[in-house]
Amino acid sequence: MNPAHLLILAAVCVSPLGASSNRPMPLNLYQFKNMVQCTVPNRSWWDFADYGCYCGRGGSGTPVDDLDRCCQVHDNCYGEAEKISRCWPYFKTYSYECSQGTLTCKGGNNACAAAVCDCDRLAAICFAGAPYNDNNYNIDLKARCQ
């Protein structure tokens, strides 16, 4: 790629990041957030971002409850999607629809997008069916997730 093009690309990508104090969210995680809000409208997305051993960054140990198990399954699903050539689940966008709490992954998604959409759809449905325990939010990972 031409060095001038790289410089322009870097400026376009970096300048919006410095304009905000909020860290940017990969596009797919934004879609996943919206899927969760579709199936669990009475809870904030952030309630799931630091829950148990698997909801949020990383994941290890035994899930603390059914909701945490949803996140473990979602992590594993992304791991399977990564086996598709050039598939990066955290950045792959897809087409889907939310209608009255029902999620549908639309046709026209390529293999990677279809897999990632299904991972997110199944996790959002799982979240809706699992009880939320406030005691499992922001837990001590070193003590409880070995």
Curated annotation (Swiss-Prot):
It is an enzyme of class 3 (hydrolase). The active site is at 74, 120. Gene3D superfamilies: Phospholipase A2 domain (1.20.90.10). It comes from the Eukaryota. Keywords: Calcium, Disulfide bond, Hydrolase, Lipid degradation, Lipid metabolism, Metal-binding, Secreted, Signal, Toxin. Residues 1-21 form the signal peptide. One of its GO terms (biological process) is phospholipid metabolic process. InterPro entries: PLipase_A2 (IPR001211), PLipase_A2_Asp_AS (IPR033112), PLipase_A2_dom (IPR016090), PLipase_A2_dom_sf (IPR036444), PLipase_A2_His_AS (IPR033113). Disulfide bonds join 38-98, 53-145, 55-71, 70-126, 77-119, 87-112, 105-117. Binds 1 Ca(2+) ion. This is Acidic phospholipase A2 C. It comes from Naja sputatrix (Malayan spitting cobra).
